[in-house]
UniProtKB/Swiss-Prot annotation:
Native species: Trichormus variabilis (strain ATCC 29413 / PCC 7937) (Anabaena variabilis)
Known role: Involved in the biosynthesis of isoprenoids. Catalyzes the 1,3-allylic rearrangement of the homoallylic substrate isopentenyl (IPP) to its allylic isomer, dimethylallyl diphosphate (DMAPP).
Keywords assigned by UniProt, alphabetized: Cytoplasm, Flavoprotein, FMN, Isomerase, Isoprene biosynthesis, Magnesium, Metal-binding, NADP
InterPro entries: Aldolase_TIM, FMN-dep_DH, IPdP_isomerase
Listed name of the protein: Isopentenyl-diphosphate delta-isomerase
Domain of life: Bacteria
Length: 350
């Protein structure tokens, strides 16, 4: 007979495999809710007065220099396919000096033999790497020791605590006790020597919530707003009964659009390191997010789709994103990301 721990680890590993399959094969994108960036437009400069070849996309984040303001957002781990994906993404991050986060490492604590699917530091020795676990696990017997093991597993520069109440509501046997979680996040922030990143999973962090998280000691906010992959839809596809499937459909478009998250968080925290993610699909989206106040931008689905195809597809995606961001800067007359952010080039449409 399997022990409860063995059963839990098998369920977690199966869930990870399901997530990859569903994201790649099913329509799990937001429909009625967009990322909100379409409400903004850059003012075109017909005389940029700069050489496109001199444009500098570099950014410094958490003390590390990135060649472009890009984060390969948290996606996967814990299965053989996930291990291959993470290796490919890590090599890309190393080659292009992007930041990278992995998917939840809970599965590797429950099943240590899959920890190697997260062991990517050897492929990305110079990359800004983020470890990852669900914040709610702090209410389910996880604490400092487990978080340190997760960080050490990746040799990570920071720890993502992903916050996903809606997903847990729809996920079969989800962990839904969020009571007192902010205090536990605060305690963990005090005890860890690496920065803690608070990240939603596609439903957004408001300015009011960011204020509480920052007061608790969180050092980075990743807004992960609505408009991209709907985890309500994903979990609805996995649902074991009609009620959960109904919940997935009902809340498929629930969340705060990414653009609103960026502006509201930046308004209450002018200097907090801020990551924009949630439905960003190209370099124009990334440039808009930076102009709205983000420091770097995270993409997950585009990198996942390319990684499953080939390393060549990943390289092509990276080159396209860089070219798109560069073109925005050139056609708005800005030579650096700092200039773009403070240029007033981005206008909200009426």
């Amino acid at each position: 007979m399997n022990s409860p721990a063995t059963s839990n680890s098998a369920q977690t590993q199966s869930r990870k495999a399901d997530h990859i399959r569903i994201c790649l094969e099913e329509d799990v994108q937001f429909r009625a809710t967009t990322n909100g960036l379409e409400r903004y437009r850059f003012n075109h400069s017909c005389l940029p007065e700069i050489d496109r070849n001199d444009i500098d996309l570099s950014a410094t984040f958490l003390g590390k220099k990135l060649n472009a303001p890009l984060l390969i957002s948290s996606m996967t781990g814990g299965t053989e396919q996930a291990g291959i994906i993470n290796q490919r993404l890590a090599r890309l991050a190393q080659d292009y000096k992007f930041a990278m986060g992995v998917g939840s490492q809970r599965v590797a604590l429950e099943k240590p033999q899959v920890a190697d699917t997260f062991a990517i530091r050897k492929y990305a020795p110079d990359v800004l790497l983020f470890a990852n676990v669900g914040a709610v696990q702090l209410n389910y017997k996880y604490g400092l020791d487990e978080c340190l093991r997760i960080i050490d597993m990746l040799e990570a520069d920071a720890l993502i605590l992903h916050i996903n109440p809606l997903q847990e509501c729809i996920q079969p046997k989800g962990d839904v006790n969020f009571q007192g979680l902010l205090d536990k996040i605060s305690e963990l922030c005090e005890e860890l020597s690496v920065p803690v990143i608070a990240k939603e999973v596609g439903n957004g962090i408001s300015g009011a919530m960011a204020k509480k998280l920052i007061a608790a000691g969180v050092q980075v906010i990743d807004v992960a707003g609505a408009g991209g992959t709907s985890w309500a839809k994903v979990e609805g596809e996995r649902a074991e009964n009609s009620m959960q499937r109904r919940l997935g459909r009902t809340f498929a478009d629930w969340g705060i659009p990414t653009a609103e998250c960026i502006t509201s968080v930046r308004a209450i925290a002018p200097h907090i390191p801020l990551i924009a993610s949630g439905g960003l699909r190209d370099g124009l989206d990334i440039a808009k997010a930076i102009a709205l106040g983000a420091d770097i931008a995270g993409l997950a689905m585009p990198f996942l789709q390319a990684a499953v195809e080939s390393e060549a597809a990943l390289q092509e995606l990276a080159e396209v994103l860089i070219a798109e961001i560069t073109t925005v800067l050139f056609c708005t007359g800005n030579a650096t990301l700092h200039q773009l952010k403070h240029s007033g080039s981005l206008q909200r449409l009426q």
